[in-house]
């Protein structure tokens, strides 16, 4: 066992040979968009992301389904499964089966098995003092999804969020491997502050980030100001408050945005300064939605984060 639940990592990793290890993870959730096919795509991309966060590639998947068959047509379930299957195929993996139950609320996701060379896996326990922090997708999907549920999200925000959530993290993982990155996590339900804090705590280090360097989805700030804040985002901020310090002048909306609960978010990478140019160039060549240097790892109380205003200036 190379990685288990004790490290708060994205997946378990089990060595099966000197040069091969299996990655095991699972994830599922309720719909966050109206279209069933798109929901299937998003749920699959979100589940596959944990494999990419560990530096691996997905191999096999099992469908996990909860469906209210007396309330929703099976045609809609078929669309969900097609969306998931198409995303898994895009990742170069295969769905081998799965399990379904009758459920009052629809749910879909995957159990995923991937592989990685044991010497090339990335974990959230390998960040070092001096590393630069790079984010590969804009954030704000939780805010936009909440507005979608209320019928308040404009078309540009829906489009931007959907594009982000249906983009695989395969290119980001490949770029990280090419730059020798050893510390990575994906930004999902605990938000940027939560997942960064977990990485820092596991690595025994602290960090500074600059709010102005963090990329945002189109329309997310406006929707947050209008009050479309998920409950999970508020809980994330409350949880992060014990380890996060803020420069003067931040309002609650700005703080909540950095804690926004993400679905199928990007990778957060900690890279040595000498390898940063290679990483950024590779991210651009792989067409990732962002390649944003947002801060740096430093010494300090493990897990602590200092948030500055403005853009990052190393």
Where are these regions (language model features)?
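Phosphate-centric recognition/catalysis
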Residues: 13
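Glycine-/charge-enriched secondary-structure boundary and capping motifs
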Residues: 69-94, 101-108, 178, 184-314
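Short pre-catalytic strand/loop immediately N-terminal to key active-site residues, enriched for Gly-Thr
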Residues: 37, 157-164, 182-183, 254-257
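Glycine-rich anion-binding loops of enzyme active sites
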Residues: 16-32, 38-41, 57-154, 192, ...
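Active-site glycine-rich loop that binds ribose-phosphate moieties when present
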Residues: 111-121, 155-176, 250
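Intrinsically disordered, low-complexity, positively charged segments
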Residues: 1-8
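Glycine- and other small-residue-rich loops at beta-strand/loop junctions that grip anionic moieties
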Residues: 2, 99, 125, 136, ...
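Alpha-helical scaffold segments that flank or form the walls of functional sites
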Residues: 38-54
